């Protein structure tokens, strides 16, 4: 498996470097040992990203089932592009931060459903993707890890989607009253980097 600190580095790198871009979704595909790593860029201050994050209406994808419309539609587009890139071979690992983590989560499931050899998915500050556990992720086939740093509020939304399928792994834990107060700074990629460096998996 690919070390989580390396996947965090690639999740950061894809904010500035990408292999392809489709409809504003930037994706970095790289090789790590025998794995093809697919890292999806997280939210930037663009209208496309803001609109994609906000499209939380429950939506039924033929491939992915019920979930967050913005994330599922984006994941379908990423899979469409990956499927025609003959240079990319499995086994696959998906990763991303924030919006990128959500798209990577949905894409990893879709890739597995299509018969691709998906081994691992690691998300950092990943919002909820699937609606009320309407789709069960293949936990027996794919090693899923979703990190929650401190009191990052993004991992809790959309709140009406119910409980998560994969329970977040908490890092950067706070004490006292601070653990009750959501902190947007805890969602920053730099905050995840700092916490993961202090608490390696």
What is each of the regions a protein language model found here?
Residues 1-95, 99-201:
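Non-catalytic, mobile gating and regulatory segments of ester bond hydrolases
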């Amino acid at each position: 498996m690919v070390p989580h600190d390396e996947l965090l580095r690639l999740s950061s790198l894809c904010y500035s470097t990408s292999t392809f871009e489709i409809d504003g979704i930037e994706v970095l595909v790289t090789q790590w040992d025998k794995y093809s790593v697919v890292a999806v860029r997280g939210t930037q201050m663009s209208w496309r990203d803001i609109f994609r994050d906000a499209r939380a209406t429950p939506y039924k994808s033929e491939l992915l089932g019920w979930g967050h419309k913005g994330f599922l539609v984006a994941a379908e587009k990423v899979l469409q592009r990956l499927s025609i890139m003959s240079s990319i071979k499995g086994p696959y690992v998906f990763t991303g931060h924030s919006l990128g983590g959500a798209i990577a989560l949905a894409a990893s499931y879709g890739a597995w459903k299509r018969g691709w050899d998906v081994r691992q998915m690691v998300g950092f500050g990943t919002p909820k993707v699937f609606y009320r556990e309407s789709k069960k992720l293949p936990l027996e086939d794919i090693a899923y890890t979703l990190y929650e740093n401190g009191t990052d509020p993004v991992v809790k939304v959309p709140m009406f989607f119910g409980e998560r399928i994969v329970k977040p792994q908490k890092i950067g834990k706070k004490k006292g009253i601070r653990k009750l107060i959501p902190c947007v700074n805890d969602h920053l990629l730099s905050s995840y980097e700092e916490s993961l460096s202090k608490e390696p998996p």
